[in-house]
Amino acid sequence: MAEEKMMRLSQVAKKLNVGTSTIIDHLSAKGYDIENNPNAKITVDMYAFLSKEYESSAQVKKEAESLTIGKKHMGDVVIDADQVNVAPEHDEEDEVRIINNSPAEAVVPEVPAVTAQEAPKTAPTAESPEDVKGNVTLQGLKVLGKIDLGTADKDSKKSAKNTKPVEKVAAEKPIEKAKPETVAPPVEPKPEPKQETPKTEQPVKKETPKAETQKPPVADKPAEKTPVVEEPAAPVADVPVQVVQAHADKLQGLTVLGKIQLPDKKKEPTRVASSDEVVDKNKNKRKRKRLNDGPNKPAGANPNGPRPAGSNPNGPRPQGTNPNGPRPQGQGGNPNGPRPAGGPNRPGVPNRPNSNGPKPTLTKASEKGEVTGKQIQDKIKATMAKLSGGGTKSGPVNRAKYRKDKRSAMADAEEERLMAEQEDAKSLKVAEFISASDLASLMDVSINEVISKCMAMGMFVSINQRLDAEAITIIADEFGYDVNFQTTGEEDDVTDVDQDDPASLIDRAPIVTIMGHVDHGKTSLLDYIRKSKVVAGEAGGITQHIGAYNVMTDSGKPITFLDTPGHEAFTAMRARGAKITDIVIIVVAADDSVMPQTKEAINHARVAGVPIIIAINKIDKPAANPDKIKEELSKENILVEDWGGKYQCQAISAKAGTGISELLDKVLLEAEMLELKANPDKRAIGAVIEASLDKGRGYVTNVLVEAGTLRIGDIILAGAHFGRVKAMVDHTGKKLKEAGPAMPLQVLGLNGAPQAGDKFQVMETEREAREISSKREQLLREQSIRTKKHITLDEIGRRLAIGNFKELNIIVKADVDGSVEALSDSLLKLSTEEIQIRILHKGVGQISESDILLASASDAIIVAFQVRPSTSARKLAEQEQIEIRMYSIIYDAINEVKDAMEGMLEPKMEEVVLGTIDVRDVFKITKVGTVAGAYVSEGIVKRNNQVRLIRDGIVMFTGTISALKRFKDDVSEVKTSYECGISLKGYNDIQIGDQIEAFEQKEVKRTL
């Protein structure tokens, strides 16, 4: 034997029906050492251990091999009389399936139970009382199993599952034998089972639970399978009575069984209803398998056969008898698949919810759930079909609808895009500071409209004045635009967000700004306070930049003064001065009145929200009238304390020093009320007052420290420029090492000139300052690109309509940034419809070669304000023939540019009447024409003058003189009160009484 010798691993695995890996793992777990190789040797001990361990698996393999003989079963059926072992083997397989056809509960117990009780035929009688107790339909099939055939099958039952093979043998015999012979005997038992049906149905069900709960009562199960053989025995007794009916009523027998079961189960509780469902589904399943049995009676005719209800013991067996062909083939035709009870179960319990056939009982039991689910599925399918545009009936309609929906969606998307573009068109992307002219160009409106809107709102702005975020928002809102401020991120915010510890705050000096009209004595007042001669050093005696000074009063308290220009060109400077100040002093001359710049200064102070003190100057002059000034101020809603208002007022004389100390006391009083404090221990922050370029020192920035302490070596960031503080000096030129709050000073070390009004702050690292500076430069470049306007067709048409449009290109250079702004504003205001001023470039510092080259390329003139060109730039300008105009007073620069513009204007042609001639007689001369004898009544008539003939006040002819004679001599002119002869070129219809008027066209210089 194979067991006595060494075997290979693959052979053992095949024999035991187990995988090699399973064998190796099992042996390894038991301590055997074996290689994972199909050719590895298995010792006798190993094999004995494995065969004992996997005995069941080997048994299954044997059974499977026996099952494969199904093909021989067809030929072996002829020997059914002897009941060869082959038949029992098939019967076993079939019986397993039949038992499985019964409810799933009964399947498991039936297989083991079949061994003992095949011979006893009296078992059915003993079971009937038990059945009466139980009334269970499912085990009716089991009761039917008690038949003599079981005795013959004892041997086969012992080897495998017992009763099942017997059934199949009985079924197979009629299949191969002549159908008439075999069919007759089994048909007879069907009527008898009808009578027994009620009896067997009830006991069968009762036995089923017993079989399930207890394996020892094997007697019950043999009863189930032996009754199959009982069928021939019972028919033998009743053959004469119902043989004919059996033949004729094969279907009726099945139908009757179904009728009996269906009503009983409907009346029975839910459990019975479920069995009915199983029956119905088995019927449907039979019909489905009928395809294999094609020629024979449809398997669906005996659905009760697979049905384990057993109410009709003949039901399942007769089904095997009558539809012998169909049933064995239906169930056993493919035994391999359904052998593990899958065949019967499939049509039964598992498939119950998915059964397709029409089942009245099933429909009633689960009508709501299934119908609802189906409806839901239908709805979902219909909806999906609509969405996908599919369908056969309405395909074209759906496709058309889909195209329509698609077009609609595209139209909606396009509309949304246009709406977004319109919204973007109404959105301005600006930095926090932008000039009024740039803002106007972004909004595509005239700068005059912007200025007029601002004046209507009480804001005084100039063309190049830099507007802050609040002003930009207000102005843009007036024109219907939304403002989107572009910043470089949170890290570049110079606002001091952190709250200072109150314990670290100290008193600081008040920052006082002196504002007022030109020549009203602002600088003289500051001069007296500083005990110096500031005015004497100023060009033209007017202030042209913001001066910042720190003054110590007689009481020992410091005050920081800012002196602003009063000229209208310095509007932006005054606005900046009001923003960084604590208190504003408005200076008004007592011998003058409240002037436009005075009103503007008052407005700036109000916008900044700072307290105002009125100083009425020049009261020592004879024409001084302080009451008149107070009255005019009241018209501007400035009511002084003397008149019951809230504004302090002091009459002073800056020259004589009258009232100066009282004025300072009032300033200190306001400062005390404001409780001005600052933290000197943090990094410094402040504002840029002015910036200039010094040839020897580089960029010099005037700053005012608002909080913290600025020290030499600090990294500061101001606008788009940064640098390390190299030196600091105060207004007197004294070098400082550090500067505390409210201290004005000059700082050296920035890499550029920041714009006046920019905030500065001390950064931790130079890298951080450089990154933020580069981001700000990028924003400014983007903004300048957006604000740059190119010529449009409308503009070209406008210029052509004017006919003589001209453009004046100017490059502005000045000593400080504030002067650059003021001069640029003033020059831009000179633009007219015919002549447009273009500021190509403006900057701080001396004139360089690059400025000359730019002027040469663009045909521009250079206006220099308090700066001079370098030596190389001067030589290049002479070579390129570029005109450089240098000024020290802003008035002179403005006036000369205005004159240049007037020179660019086309002269206006005017008609001048030189003389009048009265026609007193008319002579017609051959070959000459008509000659008029005339008298010069007024003026002088010259030979080359143009003339017009006037008759009754109507001009009849305009032309030139053909001949002018006095007596016989041709003359060049005829004066008043002289007679002459005159003929007109190309006109002979001269009549007595006509007037001839001599005139000429003259060019008249135009003015702006």
Swiss-Prot record:
Compositional bias of kind Low complexity: 294-329, 342-358
Annotated spans, Disordered: 113-136, 153-235, 253-405
Binding site for GTP: 516-523, 563-567, 617-620
Sequence ranges of Basic and acidic residues compositional bias: 153-180, 189-213, 365-381
G3, as annotated region: 563-566
Family as reported in the entry's similarity comment: Belongs to the TRAFAC class translation factor GTPase superfamily. Classic translation factor GTPase family. IF-2 subfamily.
Name of the protein: Translation initiation factor IF-2
Organism whose genome encodes this protein: Cytophaga hutchinsonii (strain ATCC 33406 / DSM 1761 / CIP 103989 / NBRC 15051 / NCIMB 9469 / D465)
Gene this protein is translated from: infB
